């Protein structure tokens, strides 16, 4: 179905799905400036935090940041896949990411081995390894505390790691607690994502359509309507567009317009009312 849909509308890829190519991601000036600041701070290590409500663009920011870091010489990026792990599993995952064999039931041995690997990497490349936590609000306190000690050296005067934390608004709230304040106070770079303006939402949508290969897929009126109803949330905008494109393909429509929007979304409340 997806291949047929792409051929029907002359699209290189589905523009409204999360797995769009990296070049299709829209970069605002604020995001670009943040990415450059993080790039410049990699050599020194430390902590970076990206926060925002669901749908404001945290995953996009992480994808773009990883792409830029992957382009830097000798930078090794590891991504924590299970942020809810307890300390023992956290050590196992970090060991796997950085190629450090760990022995079970020997946390101190793992502590020393991982720090030795990071120290060796720094001495040979002059660059800190990078560890990324998505959904970082799910990380338990004991792992956060262990991470803070694991990543620092020489009485906290040196950082062995660049840590990138991304999460919703619960993350900064947790880092203000008395137990986690020592970690929260170490955050050097912050990006707070909020609801996007109408101009940013429209620019994002137009960039997606142009990059996908069909800038004329939607009428200008429909774009404006979608932006208004998405209330600054990129995920809502993509879901609205995805549904319209699927219905248009099913009906054999050559273009998406306001009439289609009204047919699809204005009918929903009426159906719900009839069921009641």
Model-derived segments and spans:
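Conserved NTP-binding/hydrolysis module of P-loop NTPases
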Residues: 11-18, 85-104
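A short, basic N-terminal segment
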Residues: 1-44, 266, 270-276
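Short conserved motifs of the RecA-like P-loop NTPase core
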Residues: 108-116, 128, 204, 216-229
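Walker A/P-loop nucleotide-binding motif
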Residues: 44-64
